[in-house]
Amino acid sequence: MWSSPGRNLESGRFNITPRYTGTLSNGSVSSSDKVALSQLTIFNVTVADEGEYTCSVDGESASFRVDLGDSNSSGSNSGVIAGVLITLLLLIALIIILICVFWVVWRYRRRGKFDLGSCRELSCSSCSCVPLLAALKGVKLPTRHRENLNKNGTRLRLNERNHIADTNTEIYSVVQKPLKKISKSPPPLPPLTLTETELNELMSIDEKEELSPIQEKPTRRNTGLSTYSQSGTIPKLAKLTKLRKFKMKENPIYQSADELELELELQVDNTLYALPSKPNSTRNSASFTDDLASDPIYSVAINPSMFTKRSSTIGNDDDLHPYGPIYARPIKQKMRQPLNVSVDNIREVKQIGVGQFGAVVLAEMTGLSGSERCVPTKRDPSMLNGVALVAVKKLKPDVSEEVRQSFDKEIKFVSQLQHDSIVQLLAVCTHSKHPFIVMEYMENGDLNQFLQKYQMVDDDSALYSNQIPPSTLLYMAVQIASGMVYLSSLNYVHRDLATRNCLVGSNFRIKISDFGMSRNLYERVYYRVRGRAMLPIRWMATESFYGRFSEKSDAWAYGVTVWEIYTLGKKQPYEELDDQDMIQDAIRGTGRRIMGRPRGVAGCV
């Protein structure tokens, strides 16, 4: 209850700070202990009149005065007067500054120049405003509080705090008791709300026992006082002071470092792991140890007892390593050396293109040993046993030394290519004034011209000579993919993959070649840059337009090549765009135009 001398007021609800609950009751004022009242939070208090009020909780109380005043009180009038006074002082300071400025300008117009005396006088005049500004600093502007009115048009003022007197709105405010001396130390924490049974269990813990971590139990929060508040005594928590110190126990599975044995005995049951004698290879003999001992990559023969005898970690290198390093000294593979021929072995048929180093011609070659992969021509039946159809790459005359070195590097690289889907280097001629290299050629020509002779059918039944099913086209695409994977494993970038650079043999065998970009037959599919460089822009990825070629750009070109295969070479990629539009669409990056799905493309493509 709220109590006031000579008045009976309505009861009000209140809330005490966490972990302390209670109810208001009438009681006398106690001057010795008023700490708990500083933690009270009272809301929705309804008072009938101003006066002196007392709040009591559990024998502790505090008194304060409540003033009910109009919104148009004398405090607001004093605020208006202070505001007018400040405005007048500001106007006086502004007038003084303006007079000083005009005076200095007049002196300048009269004398025609500024002097130190004028500046000194202006500074002294301006400093006269300093006292006025200092006076303004000491004036407190009135603070405008929000007018919280009740039904009677009055407001409740409680220790310079505004409290809404309307009980329908819940507003919290802390009631602080007046203290003569403010203490810097924080108020003590309120006790935990525990039941008597929980407290007895907590205080009855045996200090001799090992204390386990205390699990916090959920406590009930009720609006009434707990049993401790009603009894008038506040319990204290038991202090957990005698906790057992943490100490590392001795682990029986470990020993000190000084007692460790330096020898290790392997528990082997005379059986060896079934490891192959070489990586990615199978055993050639019945016994694994036979392969292991006779394998040429080992420097010494290996005895199986080496794996079962007692060994020491401080042994010599021969005991620890019974065989020499496997990868430090690998077996040197014999480099495949191409056959050296002369100009007399070449009989040119026709020119088929112009490559990086010079012209590329189709020729017949006689007396070529080891030409099992070459296809004999049908032009001269009497020379079927000694004539092969080949492609000859010539080096331009009068080239620089740098170009000559690049030509030699290509010979060394291409001579090592050995794959069923890559054309082979057959012979070279490096001692002549006009050096050249001889490459394998297929009797059916390039893939682009080969596909244009056919018509696509949906199934493999009743095929005519000019019909081709989608399964055969997929077989061609798989062969090209196999060859490109092989080139990628050697870090080789083709840069010009297309059906025109793929050759066709018997039974639809496909081999990747690179006979030059500016062939007369396909000159229209290349874009000439500044009259010299020629780029296959319709097969190029976006980054290739900026000079970056990689395995990813070859993958893009492979996708366009597959599109060519399923259109039977009868359509040009992006044929609806001219060269300039093609370049603009490619360098745009995101949102680049994608070609339509051709007929007969399988779901796995």
From Swiss-Prot:
Ranges that cross the membrane: 85-105
Pfam families, sorted: PK_Tyr_Ser-Thr
Domain of life the protein comes from: Eukaryota
Membrane topology recorded in Swiss-Prot or TrEMBL: Single-pass membrane protein
Residue ranges of every copy of the Ig-like C2-type domain listed in the record: 1-67
Catalytic activity: L-tyrosyl-[protein] + ATP = O-phospho-L-tyrosyl-[protein] + ADP + H(+)
Cytoplasmic side: 106-605
Compartments where located: Cell membrane
SMART domains: TyrKc (SM00219)
Residues with attached carbohydrate: 26, 44, 72
EC number annotated for this UniProt entry: 2.7.10.1
List of residues binding ATP: 352-360, 393
Domain Protein kinase: 346-605
Modified residues (Phosphotyrosine): 527
Keyword terms: ATP-binding, Cell membrane, Glycoprotein, Immunoglobulin domain, Kinase, Membrane, Nucleotide-binding, Phosphoprotein, Receptor, Transferase, Transmembrane, Transmembrane helix, Tyrosine-protein kinase
Biological process terms in GO annotation: positive regulation of neuron projection development; positive regulation of phosphatidylinositol 3-kinase/protein kinase B signal transduction
Compositionally biased spans, kind Polar residues: 221-230
Topology, Extracellular side: 1-84
Residue positions of the active site: 496
Region described as Disordered: 209-230
Catalytic EC class: transferase
GO molecular function: ATP binding; collagen binding; protein tyrosine kinase collagen receptor activity
Major location (coarse): membrane
PANTHER family: DISCOIDIN DOMAIN-CONTAINING RECEPTOR TYROSINE KINASE B, TYROSINE-PROTEIN KINASE RECEPTOR
Name of the protein this chain belongs to: Class II receptor tyrosine kinase
Organism for this UniProt entry: Geodia cydonium (Sponge)
